[in-house]
């Protein structure tokens, strides 16, 4: 059975579910709803949705279904049990597809229970509600918790051995060449040393003291980033398979969310310099400018994270302007706060997943290490975590200065200006 693309909106009285099923056999259409679940079948399509709030049972007389032949869509109205109740996170596709362990099927039929493989399952209950919408992920080989705790990387710093195993094939898609030998807690300092060694004073001064018109246009460009969940995102979300993440997560939700900030920074930088669209170098930009993707670093605060992002943006990309980095930080703040929060982040993660697949150079491995797990995580992380990070971002945005970078940028600029003044003076004709 195929999981169709779907959209859900709501008014005070009902959920309005659009289901795209252009090849469905309308004669075999069947749907049901009640309690916390909605089920739709129209071969070859099957859809089962799980809500956090209750809907009325089918047959109440308040629902409806309409076939839109021009669009190949079913429009189904599902009445709410409690009128004017707000249903949250209706764009969190994966979360809607994931069964709840506490709620029930329509009309009180209990959800399928997990059974031991040795038990006889010949006598099934015949319920189409139990059709699996996603195949189980392949189990990973067990890793030493001690090694993961000390040297882990990827989402939640919970993976180990991937880079070492694939190093000959993937080359240098990350700057930390042997993460299995660099402790998690030491990576932030190692990152700063690495970036300082690669910092080009001449390139920085050129973009700072004599910025090109194109750079000035990039800095002044009005925010135009797309933040809505797209049809392409919805297709990815319904088909994306959840891998088994190690039980040894080496970070709490705040630390994991802080890591996501620098991933969003790389994406926002790339969007701004490419006129709000992806380009051939987008995969490189997004991966290179994110300390989490390029160095598997962990940060103790939002400010420390943004300083690391700023250093990398002054060291590696085409434009190396402090003013530009602060503009990008404003973009990040807008995305995570005023720009849509959870849905906006979900869209960005889906787009990054696409970018890393299409950009080549084995960057798809970053999806396996981090992005796919973040796509699932952002749909379920508690609201209070998002609120805390939003508050921290709002407080720090606009308050990072060059002194905080730790590279004596102001001294460097002053010396360059003085040298230019002396050169101009030497060029003046004697009276």
Swiss-Prot record:
InterPro entries: HSP20-like_chaperone, Shq1, SHQ1-like_CS, Shq1_C. GO terms for biological process: box H/ACA snoRNP assembly; protein-RNA complex assembly. One of its GO terms (molecular function) is unfolded protein binding. It holds the Pfam family SHQ1. One of its GO terms (cellular component) is cytoplasm. Belongs to the SHQ1 family. Required for the quantitative accumulation of H/ACA ribonucleoproteins (RNPs). This is Protein SHQ1 homolog. It comes from Caenorhabditis elegans.
């Amino acid at each position: 059975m195929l999981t169709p693309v779907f959209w859900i909106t709501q008014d005070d009285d009902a959920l309005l579910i659009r289901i795209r099923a252009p090849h469905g056999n309308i004669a075999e259409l069947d749907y049901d709803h009640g309690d916390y679940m909605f089920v739709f079948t129209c071969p070859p399509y099957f859809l089962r949705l799980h809500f956090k709030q209750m809907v009325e049972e089918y047959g109440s007389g308040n629902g409806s279904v309409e076939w839109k032949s021009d669009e190949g869509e079913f429009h189904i109205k599902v009445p709410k049990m409690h009128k004017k109740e707000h249903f949250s996170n209706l764009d969190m596709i994966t979360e809607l597809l994931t069964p709840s362990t506490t709620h029930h099927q329509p009309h009180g039929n209990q959800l399928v229970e997990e059974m031991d493989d040795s038990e006889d399952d010949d006598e099934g209950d015949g319920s189409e509600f139990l059709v699996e919408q996603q195949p189980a992920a392949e189990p990973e080989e067990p890793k030493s918790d001690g090694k993961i705790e000390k040297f882990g990387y990827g989402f939640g710093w919970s993976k180990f051995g991937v880079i070492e195993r694939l190093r000959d094939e993937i080359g240098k898609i990350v700057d930390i060449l042997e993460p299995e030998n660099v402790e998690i807690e030491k990576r932030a300092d190692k990152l700063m040393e690495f970036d300082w060694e690669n910092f080009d004073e001449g390139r920085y001064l050129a973009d700072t003291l004599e910025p090109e018109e194109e750079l000035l246009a990039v800095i002044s460009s009005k925010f135009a980033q797309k933040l809505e969940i797209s049809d392409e995102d919805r297709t990815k979300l319904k088909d994306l398979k959840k891998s088994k993440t190690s039980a040894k997560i080496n970070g709490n939700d705040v630390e994991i969310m802080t890591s996501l900030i620098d991933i969003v920074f790389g994406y926002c930088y790339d969007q701004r310099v490419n006129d709000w669209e992806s380009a051939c170098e987008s995969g490189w930009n997004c991966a290179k400018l994110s300390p989490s993707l390029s160095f598997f670093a962990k940060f103790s605060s939002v400010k420390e994270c943004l300083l690391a992002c700023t250093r990398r943006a002054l060291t590696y990309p085409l434009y190396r302007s402090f003013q530009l980095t602060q503009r990008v930080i404003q973009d990040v703040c807008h995305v995570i706060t005023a720009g849509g929060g959870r849905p906006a982040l979900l869209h960005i993660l889906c787009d990054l997943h696409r970018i890393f697949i299409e950009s080549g150079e084995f960057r798809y491995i970053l999806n396996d290490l981090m992005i796919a797990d973040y796509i699932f995580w952002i749909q379920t992380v508690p609201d209070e975590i998002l609120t805390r990070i939003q508050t921290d971002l709002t407080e720090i945005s606009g308050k990072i200065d060059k002194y905080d970078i730790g590279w004596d940028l102001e001294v460097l600029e002053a010396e360059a200006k003085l040298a230019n003044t002396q050169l101009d003076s030497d060029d003046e004709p004697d009276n």
